[in-house]
Amino acid sequence: MGSINKINSKRRDTPAPEPPPTELSREPVRPSILVVDDEENFLKLLHWFLTQRGYDVATAASADDALSLLNGRAFSVALLDVKLGTGDGIHLLDQLTQRSPDLKVIMMTAYPTAGSIKQAFDKGAVRYLTKPVDLPELAEAIKLLS
């Protein structure tokens, strides 16, 4: 005895409803990195190094410039110098993580102390690198975070 297969031959006179529109995400399309350091040559080096790896990079030479860049823009990762010429990187870290809780922050300094390292992690930093920064190590850290 054979099996009988039924075929539904109902015609669809109306197209299937479209799914409701979704909100545009504030997340960046490609990982976006904010670099804050008061050393101009170091900023240029990091900008070049990170853009070569496909990141969208914004740089700031001061805490005020960094906070201005955060308005209306989402960053995946921030690289902050602990000692800024016109401000404190740890204080900036606190401000950035309050305004953007999902931001992953890597602190950098040429003068690490146990106190500054502890303070940075207490304020939300996820990594702490000593200058001169090893660029392959930095690239790997960012890749893991973004």
Predicted feature descriptions by range:
Residues 44-52:
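Charged docking surfaces used in two-component/phosphorelay signaling
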